């Protein structure tokens, strides 16, 4: 089954889509595609069949999203915790991933036509090596596309991602690129795997479970969460519309909370800069009390040099990450 | 065409808001009627069966016994419940009631959160209200629920903690992402001073650092009050496996509402990735 579906929406679906689009729409939607195994059990099918149908549903959902004007989707494909499942099931899932990513590589033309950029978020080193290479190839070959974005969380948990971001910042400190006082909420967000995407506006979890299961904990702090009881392989266009309606009804309050949080962030950064400047001045210890104007200047100087440091560090980090994928994808040519 | 779509959209949303308002109205009023009926019937029933009136102390004891028993009959009880209020209007008495019921059922940790920091700013008012409701609902007689207000020594902020059987903690967005950032800063400082290397940092190091500053287990259940479908910054690190149950409003919330949510929680099965 292909990643990209070209069918158009039916008339009724199109009408509904247009009505929904008259209101605020989410730009980025995240899915926890839960219920594949329960679906297989219900339909008396093989477990693997459930997962396969789950993938097909994903392709269909991507088409709906595109038709609804949602250009970024993040999905939870495989959690680090899922490695605890039976060997048979884990192997089956890895095989499915192999198939789908190989298939993806044969669909280059189509992906280019639609401008689909695929990113894989997670700790790839936990995966079998051949799969790592396949994934890296898919990521590298679609890197330049910029019309729609699909982020696949694979070998991912949010805590792992956050801990990894802290590790990267500590690495930056070790390399002398940043100081420990430069660590801030904004910087941490930029060090996550998801640094190139805006935070999701809407998170949908199917199959009636009401928890996040270690998915995008940081990024969805101020997102609309919708829990739906339908099993993922049975997800329909109308379920998606219902979730969007819920998003629209919460939209104003969430927007307000986000705004408040942003203001808080700016204040914190200013406070931290002020403390750092005060420390520096104390260190110099020339004892002269500074007037307001030169204090202001010192603060401005400090914050612009901090911003430059952080920019430099983030550039280096991006290069490091790109290089990781480049190396992996070129390995296959040798092999 | 676009304006037609917009009209339909507006109409649709007006209908949805109307439906929401009607449901909320019924919820409040049915509850009030129920109370009125119970008030009317209970004295009658007691009057018929028991000439000696038990009085308020008696009903308090029986209620307390019932709540405790409810807690024991549930298959599993959360260790830590977070009360997340997303509403603009806050009723302290209703929140205090919920906290006291949680304690009576046998929940060890209760935290109260709103994203604007209202509870944190009015910490003492909330604590007073909790004490008051505790006496009102549970009565003075029991030493089991005696409450001490402690200053939290480890933290520089003056969190007041009700200790003994249950602990109540007031949380704000500062305990969420910001506390992760602070932990990150602490680790980076250690790296800067060559006490640690970046390779030492992993999930468990960060987790233990974040546990230390909070001193409470991760919440297993969050009760989210209000129509806003979001956690609004509630402890992102800690809600990894938390069940999030939505309730329409904390205003006039009843013990039965809470008990229903606890029952739902008891029915949830966690597979932990398997």
From Swiss-Prot, chain B:
EC numbers on record:
2.5.1.87
- Where does this protein chiefly localize? endoplasmic reticulum
Tell me, what is one Gene Ontology molecular-function annotation carried by this entry? ditrans,polycis-polyprenyl diphosphate synthase [(2E,6E)-farnesyl diphosphate specific] activity
Task of the protein: With DHDDS, forms the dehydrodolichyl diphosphate synthase (DDS) complex, an essential component of the dolichol monophosphate (Dol-P) biosynthetic machinery. Adds multiple copies of isopentenyl pyrophosphate (IPP) to farnesyl pyrophosphate (FPP) to produce dehydrodolichyl diphosphate (Dedol-PP), a precursor of dolichol which is utilized as a sugar carrier in protein glycosylation in the endoplasmic reticulum (ER). Regulates the glycosylation and stability of nascent NPC2, thereby promoting trafficking of LDL-derived cholesterol.
Keyword Endoplasmic reticulum assigned to the entry: answer is: yes
Q: What else is known?
A: Nus1 seems to exist in two topological orientations, a minor glycosylated species with its C-terminus oriented towards the lumen regulating NPC2 stability, and a major fraction oriented with its C-terminus directed towards the cytosol where it regulates cis-IPTase activity.
Membrane-spanning segments: 1-23, 33-49, 95-113
Q: Name one GO cellular component term.
A: dehydrodolichyl diphosphate synthase complex
Q: How does it assemble?
A: The active dehydrodolichyl diphosphate synthase complex is a heterotetramer composed of a dimer of heterodimer of dhdds and nus1.
Membrane topology listed for this record: Multi-pass membrane protein
Q: In which pathway does it act?
A: Protein modification; protein glycosylation
> Which residue positions carry a glycan here?
122
Question: What is the species listed in this Swiss-Prot or TrEMBL entry?
Answer: Danio rerio (Zebrafish)
PANTHER family attached here? DEHYDRODOLICHYL DIPHOSPHATE SYNTHASE COMPLEX SUBUNIT NUS1
Q: Name one GO biological process term.
A: intracellular cholesterol transport
Tell me what reaction this enzyme catalyses: n isopentenyl diphosphate + (2E,6E)-farnesyl diphosphate = a di-trans,poly-cis-polyprenyl diphosphate + n diphosphate
Q: What is this protein called?
A: Dehydrodolichyl diphosphate synthase complex subunit nus1
> Would the keyword Ubl conjugation turn up in this protein's UniProt record?
no
- Gene name tied to this protein: nus1
So what family is this one in?
Answer: Belongs to the UPP synthase family.
Cofactor(s) essential for the protein: Mg(2+)
User: What domain of life is recorded for the organism?
Assistant: Eukaryota
Q: Which UniProt keywords apply?
A: Endoplasmic reticulum, Glycoprotein, Magnesium, Membrane, Receptor, Transferase, Transmembrane, Transmembrane helix
**Location(s) in or outside the cell:** Endoplasmic reticulum membrane
